[in-house]
Amino acid sequence: MLNGEKSALGEMPSNSNSSSKLNAKSPNFIPSSSNIPRSSAKTKEHSADRKPHRNSEKKTQGMPRKNQQLASSERKTKNKKRLEKQSSAIADSIGESLDDPQTVYDEHLFDILSARTNKRGQINLNHLLNFQFTPRTNSNAFSAPPRRSRGYNTYGQGSGHHPMDKSRYVNANYRFVVSPIGDYQSQKLDPDSPVKWEDVWQVLCSSDFQLAACPFCLEEKPVAARMSRCGHVYCFSCLLRFVETPTAAEVKAAETSGTKIVKCGHRSCPICWDSIRLRDVHPIRWVEDKEFQKLEEGKSVCLRLYQRNNGSILAFPRSCRSFALDGSFHSDEIPNFTMSGAAYARIIIGSHDYMVQQHLLEIEQLQQIAAEDISLYGSADTYYERITQILLDRISSLSESVNEQNIKSLQTDIDNLCLQSNSLKQLSEVDDLNDVSGSEIADAYLFYQPFAHSHIYLSPLDIRILKSAFGSYENFPDELVPRVERISSGHLVNSELRQRFKYMAHLPEGCEVAFIECDWSKIIPKEVLLTFKSEISKRRKQRKAQEMREERYRQRAERDTEEQIYSELNMQRPVPKTVVHEDPAEAFPTLGSHHQFESTDEVNTDESTLSTAKTVWGTRALANIQNDTDDQDDLDGWKVDWDKVAQLSAPSKNSKNKKKKKLVLLSTGAAHR
């Protein structure tokens, strides 16, 4: 024990020997009856025989007060020794000394001890190695969305609610006229890179297969159409009215506050609930393609051979290559709207004069519609005048910007002239414009399309048939007119599809493409088609099996929909009625009919079939129904067969001593014997 420590039995004498003899934990302790109080000797013996309880609180409660003090002092001593041992081990590891009594109770040393030491007194010295793992960094800018039980994302990329998804959709399905001062190097190298919405001046849409009705007036072809960031199309007059019309909440707030209604500069899209601002909408130009063809299965289609140079995003007909004297087909640059390649480009560089001309066409269209409304209804919409004034202001601002940027436009014109002169020099060195060098052909991709920007291509088997017939892609004819057997649509461009079909590398991701399967019996020789006979027949069988499978799915879906409707309305599904078609000649035979000359057996069979009972609905009744009714008539008591009664009452010859049977008649109310 430590010096100066008080014993658990009370005040101890100054003599250490006597104190050690009285201390139960001391090795000099001598048990005797004199050392134990008489009153507690019996209790001490019983407590020594019993096993210690697990719970320390119950153990201390059962002990005398003096023994409780002894146990508490023992615990303090053990804890103190353990701390001293751990602190000494830590001091040895870090090179400190415990000679100073303050070092044992140093707070810093105790913190190190509690952090580095386990229950067994072992010390972790990894901090002395000066080794540390590099922190994990996420290479992606956006973290992955949380995993959900549903199979689709509710937000983020791929859900349709993310701005990037909408910009990718617009980038994949439309063409653009962009500002001449923008930087489009990323779009030339990567078709998936969307054009900045601020650089877009006009959106080009096909009037043949990209018409979108206005969600407000339901006009099939919107007037002075405008497109928002989300890709939805509206009439300019409808959109302006929608934005400027206050909502019920705004009117109520203005009435309560006693102020004017504040005009809101934005509204939510009625289709996708995305924010719409008037400054973010861009005009739309409806483009009509003279080469447009509506594809139908079983009809012929004219296919043109298109060419795309390696690394370029411009695909053009190979037959038009010799007529492009402006160099648009010989350069990888984005063409201007005046070049020949602008009709086949997805991104076109515009000019202020071009936009002024387009705005004037919109004003002319609005005036024509206003005149029609006045002739029909007596008045025109006031928003037509508002839109006309907005377009006139836009034209004036464009004219001012043209005057300010004369130097820049002059420089661009000089660059275009230099480019055209270089292309003319290059073309003049070539004797035959139709002959293309082998290096250019090796770097170019050839494919068939019905018309520009149609995204309709031949299936892989058809391409193999053509290559087997013509030898190589360079020998393909510029035009082919096969018969379409099947159209497979709904394929989206992705990395897999690009890896499989190299000629689709210029299409942006998310673009929808279709493949057609054609009948080449009138174009390709029969000897070539015989080599692919098994594959063609297999493809046709698969097509028929798919059609049957789709028909079964359609019928099943219709049946499930009907069942759901009947279950929601708590109605029972009606049972289809069986309609019996009868020949009037058989139902009403005439005297001169040919049935009179038939055999008696056939007549009997016909009579038996005609005599069968039928229900009031025209269906055939069961044969035993009539017999059952006859039995019931016999048992009702009102129709008695007296001949049968006489036979039963007459005595039989063989029965001499037998008792006669008595007949019970039910003609009266009670039975009489």
UniProtKB/Swiss-Prot annotation:
Instruction: Provide the primary localization.
Output: cytoplasm
Give the Low complexity compositional bias ranges: 13-40
Question: What are the annotated disulfide bridges?
Answer: none
Residues in RING-type zinc fingers run 214-273
Which cellular component terms (GO) are annotated to the entry? Answer: cytoplasm; cytosol; nucleus
**Region described as Disordered:** 1-95, 649-673
| GO BP annotations, alphabetical order | positive regulation of transcription by RNA polymerase II
- Give the location in the cell: Cytoplasm; Nucleus
Q: Where is the composition biased (Basic and acidic residues)?
A: 42-60
Domain of life (superkingdom): Eukaryota
Q: Which SMART domains match?
A: RING
GO molecular function term, any single one = ubiquitin-like protein ligase activity
Q: Keywords in UniProt for this one?
A: Cytoplasm, Metal-binding, Nucleus, Zinc, Zinc-finger
InterPro entries, per database record: MAG2/RNF10, Znf_C3HC4_RING-type, Znf_RING, Znf_RING/FYVE/PHD, Znf_RING_CS
Kindly provide the name given to this protein in its UniProt entry.
Uncharacterized RING finger protein P8B7.23
Could you tell me which species this protein originates from? Schizosaccharomyces pombe (strain 972 / ATCC 24843)
